[in-house]
Amino acid sequence: MKVYFTASIVGKKHHLGDYLKIIETLKSKNCEVISDHIINSSESQIRMETREERLKFHRQLEKWIRESDFMVAETTFPSISVGYEISLAQHLLKPILILYSTGSPPSLLAHHKDEKLVCEKYSSDILSDLIDDFINYVKGTNDSRFTFFITAKIASFLEKVSKSEKIPKSVYLRKLIEQDMQYKR
């Protein structure tokens, strides 16, 4: 599968290790990752580009997103450019995994009602499982995506279990259901 990866170029000085971990995790799952435009670019390079160079790059960026199977955006460091790329991917109906490692989820995206947009807090312990779940969703190997509302008390419990067992909340819930299915056969 072809994946378009994006993240803040300015935030790279603080989060490069996280960016590389995400890219390597995607590659380990046999994904072709488009990421050089983030990893190999600098703020000063971008400022030095001419208008024509910026327009040419923008056309290339649109092509990469259009040709990708899905997008992964690391959004811990806020970026209007990353937000624009996410909006473009949404317009093209691409599945998008928004990742953030600290703080709150991106406020304009986390509460957006779009089943193709998934926003997850991650750590290196659960990153691989989160990406596996998302790839399975994109491939359609999951029967369906099921979204439901839970109380704050349940959300708090899920967060605690997720951290202590170092697994995504969705994996924990799936295991509970699978155990119950076996018990009730």
Give the location of each predicted region:
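Catalytic donor nucleotide-activated moiety binding site of glycosyltransferases and closely related
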Residues: 23-52
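TIR-domain catalytic/interaction hotspot
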Residues: 44-70, 81
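Conserved TIR/SEFIR loop-to-helix hotspot centered on a Trp-containing motif
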Residues: 77-88
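A short helix->loop->beta-strand "cap" motif at the edges of active sites that frequently abuts
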Residues: 92-96
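Short, glycine/polar-rich helix-capping loops at beta-to-alpha or helix-loop-helix junctions
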Residues: 102-111
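Short acidic-hydrophobic, aromatic-tinged amphipathic segments that line or gate anion-handling sites
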Residues: 115-130
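Short Lys/Arg-rich basic patches
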Residues: 134-154, 159-163
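Short, basic amphipathic alpha-helical segments that act as recognition/interaction helices
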Residues: 165-185
